[in-house]
Amino acid sequence: MNRDLSKGSVVKSMLLFAIPMILGDLLQQCYNIADTLIVGQFLGEKALAAVGSSFTLMTFITSIILGLCIGSGVLFSIRFGQRDENGLKEDICASFFFITAVTILLNIIAYISLSGLRTFLRVPDEVWGDMKEYLFVIFMGIPAVFLYNYFASYLRAIGNSVIPLLFLAVSSILNIILDLWFVIGLKLGVAGAAKATVISQYLSGIGIMVYTLMRYKQVCAIWKIRYLKKERIREIISFSMLTCIQQSVMNLGILMVQGLVNSFGTVVMAAFAAAVKIDAFAYMPVQDFGNAFSTFIAQNYGAKEKKRIQQGLKAAVRISAIFCVVVSTFVYIFSKPLMMIFVDAKETAIIMEGVRYLRIEGAFYIGIGWLFLLYGLYRALGRPGMSVVLTVFSLGTRVALAYILSAIPAIGVVGIWWSVPIGWALADIVGLLYYKIKKQNLVEKEPEM
């Protein structure tokens, strides 16, 4: 199932590699969709607001792990393109030890800081009880998030995007079954929804680890100290930490916006919780396509296939644009029925606020589609620092505008919604201008690791 992306048709290579990744992440969204749908329909508005705020926080925490795994995956792709098997083993060993340590530390910090989150996120009293109960359980799944994303990153780096999809498919089905059983059958409340997600996460995490260790002997280097080199650890830290910073800054900005949203009350919180799930589901395919594109570029960068890099970029821009136009049209037209999937039809105030959010965000998905391509391009060319710059620029603009615009009485909460596409557009302009100016140097020079 391995795929050498430095050979064959450019468009076909990218699409065949990207499709399983897209399907896989759409299934992963089903983890969160199942929680939101069942909680919203059977546990009510306050529980939905609690799970929605928890989702934003967990996205921030797991983004740190995800960033480290994505960064390591890019290095794996470059080594694979270079046919450097020994270097690949050393990177595997160094990255596994480092990310394991970070995961353990992160899990400890999450539990220690649990009580302080109430003030930081401005969580209303009537929501905090459910939110705390949900988070206490969901934090147990952090190690599982690491296991799945680490081994999935390795498999994708060598061109295998099918196996991660299969493990996610099984765990997603299990998640939905357990959600229904725990919440509706056993009446376990929000804790039941969290338990369903955690059990499913461990199934996919442990399963993909066992498969990868049995199928690819070079991955057994994670246990072999002789492959643990100081220079590789420095390389992993310098490269992966920048990708980690990019992912965590991205979600820290969203977390700050969540705090602002919470200050507008339970109705806006619930609308945001449901709409964000739809939003993430809608643009998740272009995010995954951006990650697949990054692997394509990294393998070709390692193989020194400069012409294919240029061809791949042009093709990716067109593919992303076509997809975004289709999805934007769908979300804009069907925003109300989409909201009613998560919210009872009687909750008209929540539905209408969610519709307003979706029609503003949905009209500009092409902005985030191209931004994901730029993130992937700069990571793959060994310039993760530029991805961080674009993320800080986009999120900085978004957070600043959200606070400024929402403070104007005539604009209010809608200012938060408009800040998002504006941030996307400005970051796109900066990223494209930088590429246009530095194009030749980016492809010619060695990666900055």
Residue ranges of predicted features:
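Short alpha-helical transmembrane segments in multi-pass integral membrane proteins
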Residues: 1-18, 76-141, 185-241, 297-364, ...
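N-terminal transmembrane alpha-helices
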Residues: 5-43, 56-71, 75, 100-107, ...
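Transmembrane helical elements of multi-pass membrane transporters/channels
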Residues: 16-35, 137, 171, 200-204, ...
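Helix-terminus/linker motif at the lipid-water interface of multi-pass membrane proteins
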Residues: 30-48, 118-125, 181-188, 248-277, ...
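Small-residue hotspots at the loop-to-helix junctions and early N-terminal turns
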Residues: 45-56, 135, 194, 266-281, ...
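Small-residue-rich hydrophobic transmembrane alpha-helices
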Residues: 48-108, 145-164, 271-335, 368-390
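Hydrophobic transmembrane alpha-helices of multi-pass small-molecule transporters
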Residues: 60-63, 175-179, 205-209, 281-284, ...
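Short runs within selected transmembrane alpha-helices of multi-pass transporters and secretion channels
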Residues: 69, 138-156, 164-172, 193-208, ...
